[in-house]
A protein has these predicted regions:
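Redox- and metal-dependent alpha/beta enzyme cores, enriched for Fe-S-associated oxidoreductases
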Residues: 152-171
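Conserved thiamine diphosphate
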Residues: 2-149
Length: 171
């Protein structure tokens, strides 16, 4: 509710604030009415949910945020992202803070992890930045003999890379 109230500052006081808040992602549904109404009122905020996905599986089913991606995908007025790497997060946050200020912009929902991942060392080209914001990019472009493409998002990146290596060796 506080994010929604601060996110309405432009329509109430003529000055836009850029509030950023955190939430325990598995329990985002507990504040879903406030999130929905905030988006319907064109409130602008960035909400960060951690930990995303099933990274807390040992703690039981209530601690797995399996359905929360659907909230970000289906709620009008909010853009949802689940980056795997910090360079992606940097690109998304920079874009998101700009998007929140645009007349036709909206809010941002980031689903992040607390699980450590090895970070890539790569050149962030303009094309890569655009692809990150648009939701997908090739980690490795498929060659002419490609038989399988594995798509992923978020914290499972290292597991996907391991699976791809295993499949390549098994072939």
């Amino acid at each position: 509710i506080a994010l929604a109230a601060a996110g309405l500052s432009d329509s109430l006081f003529g000055k836009r604030l850029l509030p950023i808040g955190t939430i325990y992602d598995p329990f985002v549904c507990r504040g879903l009415d406030a999130l929905n109404y905030a988006c319907y009122q064109d409130a602008r905020f960035m909400i960060v949910g951690t930990p995303s996905g099933v990274t807390l599986a040992p703690e039981g089913g209530a601690h797995q945020s399996i359905s929360t991606p659907l909230i970000g995908l289906s709620q009008d007025g909010i853009m949802s992202f689940e980056p795997a790497f910090v360079d992606e997060l940097s690109i998304i946050m920079s874009w998101g803070l700009s998007f929140m200020q645009q007349d036709d912009g909206g809010s941002i929902y980031l689903r992040l992890t607390t699980r450590p991942l090895e970070q890539p060392k790569r050149q962030l080209t303009d094309n890569l930045k655009n692809d990150v914001v648009n939701g997908a990019y090739w980690w490795r472009e498929p060659g002419p003999n490609c038989e399988l493409i594995i798509a992923y998002q978020g914290v499972v990146a290292d597991q996907v890379f391991s699976a791809a290596g295993y499949l390549a060796e098994a072939k």
